[in-house]
């Protein structure tokens, strides 16, 4: 990930477990991995991010975005280390005219937003040392993202149908990584 690359560039050692190394659906696996890792901070980027599919996979979305976050937060508390939690603009309902700030009232309108807000609440309630970063439309040059998703069908059909009532701020992972580190 770009976060790992940025940390390494700045001289930090990192752990970046894949799904087989860190099963976010297993509290025991999370506890064992983190408590035995000797880490000095946690940057929690992992998430269930398929917003539409989350409506059909509610339990899995909540398990990954909320419950796993609670377990990670508990480990950070035990180790007395800071944590950065990557959240989303989906914690808001999108009805405000203008930009949202961290002081605006949250009001998620879907399971994804609800699950990320639940994760935020665990971070705030359990930890003293934390940052919550709400970002949107995250993209990089390699992965699936909104821009690639839109370009693919438009190239194939020379036509594209999308919603016209959504406003967002695309976030490049390299830029975000520099700010996080």
Task: Describe each region flagged by the PLM.
Residues 56-84:
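NAD(P)-cofactor binding segment of oxidoreductase domains
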Residues 63, 67-71, 91-133, 137-139:
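Catalytic helix-loop patch of NAD(P)-dependent Rossmann-fold dehydrogenases
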Residues 121-181:
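NAD(P)-dependent short-chain dehydrogenase/reductase
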Residues 17, 42-46, 83-88, 93, ...:
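SDR active-site strand-loop-helix element
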Residues 3, 7:
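Aromatic pocket-lining residues of Rossmann-like dinucleotide-binding sites
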Residues 8-32:
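Adenosine-cofactor binding site in Rossmann-like domains, unifying the SAM/SAH pocket
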Residues 52-59, 94-98, 143-144:
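Conserved catalytic-core motifs of eukaryotic protein kinase domains, centered on the activation segment
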Residues 27-64:
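NAD(P)H-binding glycine-rich loop region in Rossmannoid oxidoreductase-like domains
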